[in-house]
């Protein structure tokens, strides 16, 4: 299979490396092209045969093709491919999907989060609000005929690049897209499950970042394992409520893109979003936290959008609201915890 991975950050590079190495045990070797927008980055990747900025210590397979440097090179990178993987940040999804809208092969994205704003006329009145959109909603606006999907789940890029066992979910309303993702990536170190609930898979992947900030805060304040378990469980309830209100199936959130991704991001030491909470608990300002990270922490940028969309749908999300207040400097860490603990008693499973 010929696969183009567009975006040479940590996750795009990791997936390209994994696919290029895949062979044996019934898995055929793929021809994989990794594309980067920046020509200088491509030159560095070619010279070093490694992505030293995002995945130091991981060698790029000799078979991995490298391209990049602009729209012309993008056209070359996707020409003749069987599958296109969009591994760019959410902020670039609209531009990339617009350029790929006439693609004749399946396109799947790895992005987890929301756009900062609505940049074009919405495809339906339900989207005519000043809220950022998830990538499947952007696709509905700019590339409605594209056979598309989302590839998500509990996964740190470094572990995928190392070939450590990982399970992901390929979600699309098109069976062809699901089958292409399974054929491309299911193998010795990646187990790929299929789903037709794109909305649920995207909501889980996006909103868990906000909950991971809260989990980091919990750990940073040394509130204990009981508190962490409670926060993860109630965070999942909030994610599920929002997802169902947006059209997802509740059971999707018990799977890899819901519970799985939340547990990993809320507890893993490689989680940038969890680190945000840890540093805020130490008394650092948000500006100091972002400067120290060096990479994107999507939870910081999508927290307000999550709360806005929840409010527009009448969905109660107190943990997400507390995270926004904390990021805005309106609450101290200890105050956020106190507010959550002082809420009125409720029935546990009266969620959706």
Swiss-Prot record:
This is Glycerol-3-phosphate dehydrogenase [NAD(P)+]. Pathway: Membrane lipid metabolism; glycerophospholipid metabolism. It catalyses: sn-glycerol 3-phosphate + NAD(+) = dihydroxyacetone phosphate + NADH + H(+); sn-glycerol 3-phosphate + NADP(+) = dihydroxyacetone phosphate + NADPH + H(+). The lineage of its organism: Bacteria, Pseudomonadati, Pseudomonadota, Betaproteobacteria, Burkholderiales. The active site is at 208 (proton acceptor). One of its GO terms (cellular component) is cytosol. NADPH binds at residues 11, 37, 112, 157, 272, 296, 298. Keywords: Cytoplasm, Lipid biosynthesis, Lipid metabolism, NAD, NADP, Nucleotide-binding, Oxidoreductase, Phospholipid biosynthesis, Phospholipid metabolism. NCBIfam families: PRK00094.1-2 (NF000940), PRK00094.1-4 (NF000942). The keyword Lipoprotein does not apply. GO terms for biological process: carbohydrate metabolic process; glycerol-3-phosphate biosynthetic process; glycerol-3-phosphate catabolic process; glycerophospholipid metabolic process; phospholipid biosynthetic process. Its EC number is 1.1.1.94. Catalyzes the reduction of the glycolytic intermediate dihydroxyacetone phosphate (DHAP) to sn-glycerol 3-phosphate (G3P), the key precursor for phospholipid synthesis. Belongs to the NAD-dependent glycerol-3-phosphate dehydrogenase family. It is found in: Cytoplasm. It comes from Polaromonas naphthalenivorans (strain CJ2). It holds the Pfam family NAD_Gly3P_dh_N. Sn-glycerol 3-phosphate binds at residues 112, 153, 155, 208, 261, 271-273. Its main location: cytoplasm. SUPFAM superfamilies: 6-phosphogluconate dehydrogenase C-terminal domain-like, NAD(P)-binding Rossmann-fold domains. GO terms for molecular function: glycerol-3-phosphate dehydrogenase [NAD(P)+] activity; NAD binding.
């Amino acid at each position: 299979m010929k696969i183009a991975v567009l975006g040479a950050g940590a996750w795009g590079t990791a997936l390209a490396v994994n696919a290029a190495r895949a062979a044996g045990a019934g898995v055929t070797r793929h021809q994989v092209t990794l594309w980067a927008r920046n020509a200088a980055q491509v030159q560095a990747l070619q010279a070093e045969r490694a992505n030293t900025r995002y995945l130091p210590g991981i060698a790029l397979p000799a078979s991995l093709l490298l391209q990049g440097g602009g729209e012309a090179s993008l056209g070359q990178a996707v020409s003749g491919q069987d599958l296109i993987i969009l591994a760019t940040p959410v902020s670039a999804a609209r531009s990339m999907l617009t350029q790929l809208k006439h693609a004749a092969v399946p396109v799947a994205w790895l992005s987890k989060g929301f756009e900062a704003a609505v940049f074009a006329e919405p495809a339906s009145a339900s989207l005519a609000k000043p809220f950022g959109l998830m990538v499947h909603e952007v696709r509905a606006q700019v590339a409605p005929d594209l056979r598309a999907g989302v590839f998500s789940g509990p996964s740190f890029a470094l572990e995928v690049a190392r070939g450590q066992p990982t399970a992901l979910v390929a979600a699309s309303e098109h069976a062809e897209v699901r089958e292409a993702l399974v054929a491309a990536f299911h193998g010795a170190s990646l187990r790929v499950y299929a789903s037709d609930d794109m909305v649920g898979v995207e909501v889980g992947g996006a909103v868990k970042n906000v909950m991971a900030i809260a989990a980091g805060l919990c750990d940073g304040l040394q509130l204990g394992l009981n508190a962490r378990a409670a926060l993860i469980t109630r965070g999942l309830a909030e994610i599920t409520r929002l997802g169902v209100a947006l059209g997802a199936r509740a059971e999707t959130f018990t799977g890899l893109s819901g519970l799985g991704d939340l547990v990993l991001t809320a507890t893993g030491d490689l989680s940038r979003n969890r680190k945000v909470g840890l540093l805020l608990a130490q008394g650092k300002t948000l500006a100091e936290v972002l400067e120290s990270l060096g990479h994107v922490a999507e939870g910081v940028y999508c927290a307000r959008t999550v709360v806005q969309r929840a409010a527009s749908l009448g969905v109660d999300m107190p943990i997400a609201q507390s995270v926004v207040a904390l990021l805005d400097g309106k609450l101290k860490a200890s105050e956020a915890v106190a507010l959550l603990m002082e809420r009125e008693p409720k029935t546990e499973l009266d969620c959706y």
